[in-house]
Amino acid sequence: MASNESLQTTAAMAPVTIERRVNPNLDDELPKPFLPRALVAVDTEHPSGTPGHQHGDMSVLQQHVAFFDRNNDGIVYPWETFLGLRAVGFNIIISFFGCLIINISLSYATLPGWIPSPFFPIYIDRIHRAKHGSDSEVYDTEGRFVPSKFEEIFTKNARTHPDKLSFSELWNLTEHNRNALDPLGWVAAKLEWFLLYLLAKDPHGFVPKEAARGVFDGSLFEFCEKSRRSNKQQ
């Protein structure tokens, strides 16, 4: 009895633990799911990460940001963020406001010194300092990828399909992850998932699990850019 209780993931007096379930057998489906991965974004379907994706010895969070480093100098300026957003398929308006919001909000935390820069650069080697609250915690505080937290996105929130998220389910995800007294984190999380929804939703209005995983290591951005190039060449 005590042994069974020590492994329970739900509590009758805490209905939220029943509503938002976790996978108790995750370690049978993925080796060491609670071990943060520094180089690859893994899940139960991709235990070795994204096939063909080059990590470049960067953390998974750094890989996510590095796509927008268009000249590969380790620094992302607003105009590079704009070009990156355009490259994956966002229109000019979203790309313009997106680059302003992203660089203005993230730049200072990544700077090597205390003096702000009027160019709002984002330094990739310090991007872990810009991690905001009220997020999914799939990235840890050093920028590693935590597989168990990624799987929880779907076990806790996917109600229509186990491997897809609707817009309302994404909204609920951001509501569930809210930390107290963290309005900046609340807004940032909603903006991030809204942009992913615009970018990756399927014809039925769902974001597939593979697309969500791909955004964490940046492979989704690479896929979208290559797809757009191929379509233009046809």
Swiss-Prot record:
GO terms for molecular function: calcium ion binding; heme binding; monooxygenase activity; plant seed peroxygenase activity; protein homodimerization activity. It is an enzyme of class 1 (oxidoreductase). Belongs to the caleosin family. GO terms for biological process: negative regulation of lipid storage. Calcium-binding peroxygenase involved in the degradation of storage lipid in oil bodies. It comes from the Eukaryota. Binds 1 heme b (iron(II)-protoporphyrin IX) group. Ca(2+) binds at D69, N71, D73, E80. Its EC number is 1.11.2.3. The keyword Acetylation applies. Expressed in pollen (at protein level). Residues 56-91 form the EF-hand domain. Its cofactor is heme b; Ca(2+). The modification N-acetylalanine is found at A2. Its main location: other. GO terms for cellular component: endoplasmic reticulum; membrane; monolayer-surrounded lipid storage body. InterPro entries: Caleosin-related. This is Peroxygenase. Homodimer.
